[in-house]
Amino acid sequence: MKKPHLILFFILNFSLAISSQIVIKGKILDENNKPLTGANILAFPTNNGKLAHNVSDNLGNYTLSLTKNTTYNTSISFMGFITRKEILNNTKKDSIINFILKEDPNKLEEIVIKYKIPVRIRKDTTTYNTDAFTNGKERKLKQVLKKLPGVEVDRKGNVTVKGKKVTTLLVDNKKFFTGDTKLAVNNIPADVIDKIDVIEDYHENAFMKGLEKSDEIAMNISLKEDKKKFVFGDIEAGLGIKNRYVLHPAIFKYSPKTNYSFIGDFNNTNRKSFTLRDYINFDGGLDMNNLKEVIQSPVVKLLRNQNFTASKHKFGGYNMQHAKNEKLSISSFLIALSDKTNSRVENFRNYLIDNITERLREDERNNQNLFLGKIQFLYKPEENTRIKYYTKFEKTSINQTIENNRDLANSIINFNENNLINSDKINSYLKAEKKFSTYHTSQAIVNFNFNKIDDSTNWLTNTNIFPNNIPINEKESINVLKKSSTEKFEYNVALKHFWILDNVNHLYFNVGNNFEQNKFKSNLQQDNTTFSNFSNNLEHNQFTIFTSILYKKLIGDAIFTAELKYQNYYRTSLDLNNNSSYQSNLLLPKIEMDWDITNRKKLIFKYNLTNTFPSTRQLISNNILNNYNNIYTGNTDLKETFYHFVSLSYRNYKTYGWSFYPSIYYKIRNNQVQNIFNTSTIFNIINPINIDTPNKSLTTNFRVVYNYKYWKATVLTEYTNSNYATFINNNKIKSNNNSFLTRASFRTVYDNKPNIDFSYSQTHKDNTNSLFSAISNLSNLDVAVDYEYKNWKFKTEYLYNFYKNNATKNTNSFNELNASIFYQKENSPWGFELLGTNIGNNISKLNSTLSSNLFSERRTLVFPRTFVVKAIYKL
């Protein structure tokens, strides 16, 4: 670090803060000296000091961090026991104090108390009363969540509770936009929040709980009563050097029947309100069945790039939720995005077969427009019947221009590439659920999807840059155009019945089918001449019938699940008078053991066998020009790929103290669809086949967390190994990739002292095949400091990474300093902020990749230094 005295200052400050604290710990027991798990203990300071709270673990242990020389009124409570009150006078040193609670002879269902308990745990719901943890200076939900015990928020807005990721965010029990946490934590004002509920094993439908397993964790934000009938929110506006501007309104109106939300973002800085993750969440998230389709989506390819040198970003999101009556509710949202960005990438490539080097500079301009929407109806005619219907739609338009400057073996070539993409998607979904009795519940799902993509790429060059087997007409100006069109219609029907045999045995039956109709057309032409061997007109249909039986058994505190699925698959392909068909019958087993050792310890074992089928493009019989130097040829004989997946994970969580999260994952891919490379100098002809060599990958990680009342420390180690094979010019190439990651982080959450958020990681990669070996190291340092002094808030962030590639001896260091100063007078609706990003004005980042036939180093230019002055008005 350039200024080590700053770190010394914070270390000294932290040491002084620790020295002013003492620790009281012990056990909470009943009259038979048996531990009480989940008992609440609160310590209220009578003068200066901070309220302390803890919940006893499965052994009855508790820990309180108290301010030295302060008297506390202590309350210890547990459901069904008499609340005990104690006074701790002038606490001066660490002590061990045990508390014994007497059983309440009245056995009340609820203990009536005069104060709000900061944290209340009831089965799978944890409730935080936020006033007990905040000081009123927090601006957004994000700052509130950081102060709650067991809750973490990263820089991107991801929220985890007790080490598990929050997947759905609700406001007053209604989903906020798509349910993703990022929009909520960065936009909902802190002063409207009354309490926060964290719901594990979350289900939209209450009577399905206990039947369908849910890995979802929901966070419900309850608003204060005086905020439910008024408009609230804030508006940010700012100007900066080099004509920078920022306008960010976030306006909300909530009422008992109808809620409205609007979030806008208009700027030409490096700030993005809608990212790749937001789009994937809108599209239903990632799973094995749609992973390939999502990754290859044109929208994903552009949203994935977050490094640009210029940007004009326009974003608007509108959300409405209306309860027409007790039976029918309607919700909808619209999201509009317009992005114009410029970026530059410099590539150094080593083609391993011929040991030829290439330098390629790409100057890219993107104009992207995206419109997303959803309308949903939820109908509950009676308590045990629920019908949900929604329609989602998406319209995308992308115009991309790339100027390429290429140095191949000291030969300079310049050419341009223009891409036009238009995409339309519609998805309709209907789910009906009926509980007939305590023992029988049924579910029916019908799903329709339609997707159309029109894609064209135009290469303009003065030199023939294309593979030799394309009969290019050599002339002064070469114009090559590729057009493709993809249409997909799909419907899914599934019927499921849940049969509860008794309290410990469940039996579930599932039957359904899936139909896909895919049409793909493509051609390649120079001027008005079409190359016949690059014309494709494929109609690909596939029909799947499946049925499964699932047995679930409760064994002590563990749930054992075994499922056997039968799948019949049939496809037909017709492409330019070439007919082919394929049929398979499969049995796919699945086993899971979910053991709740205690309410804080959990062990999960999973094994399942799944499969994926080849995509439409992989089944074409002619060629596609993927890129100017890359030809793809399909294979009509491809079969399915099988995935054996085994995992074992353990969680031992404590609100304060040590928490452990070890896990191991192993995956084997058999009969994998793998690309065969036939290379000629730098040109690749790629053909997919099913290979008999398994693709194996192993990942182990171990995360250790230590939680203290005012700080948290985390250490993570992760190792990944993958072994796979490809074919280059009919030669099998085996690759072995190893990756080692170590990360340490430290974060404080003091009220009236500087807070530090520190993270350091070291990544070592060892990628080897028979042609090349690449060893690289990447170090990342991230330090953020924020401090509140009266009406001022100071915040700074320093990022540093150092990259070294031992194969090329190349090194690169990158550092970025961001800072802000915020001022808001107490009880004033106005706030002002000076914000600076990339203050050191660093230029680029560097990384490398290795494939079976290519080693590449990629230097990416980053957004330049920016200063903006903002005014914020709170409604």
Give the ranges of each region predicted by the language model.
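Membrane-proximal, glycine/serine-rich, low-complexity loop/turn segments characteristic
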Residues: 21, 33, 59-61, 82-94, ...
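Structural motif
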Residues: 25-36
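A short, solvent-exposed loop/turn motif at the edges and junctions
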Residues: 43-50, 71, 75-87
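Short, acidic Ser/Thr/Gly-rich low-complexity loop/linker segments typical of extracellular
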Residues: 47-61
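Surface-exposed extracellular loop regions of Gram-negative outer-membrane beta-barrel proteins
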Residues: 214-235, 327, 337-360, 371-380, ...
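Outer membrane beta-barrel strand-and-loop segments of large Gram-negative receptors
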Residues: 361, 534-538, 546, 639, ...
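Conserved C-terminal beta-signal and adjacent last beta-strands/turns
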Residues: 741-764, 770-875
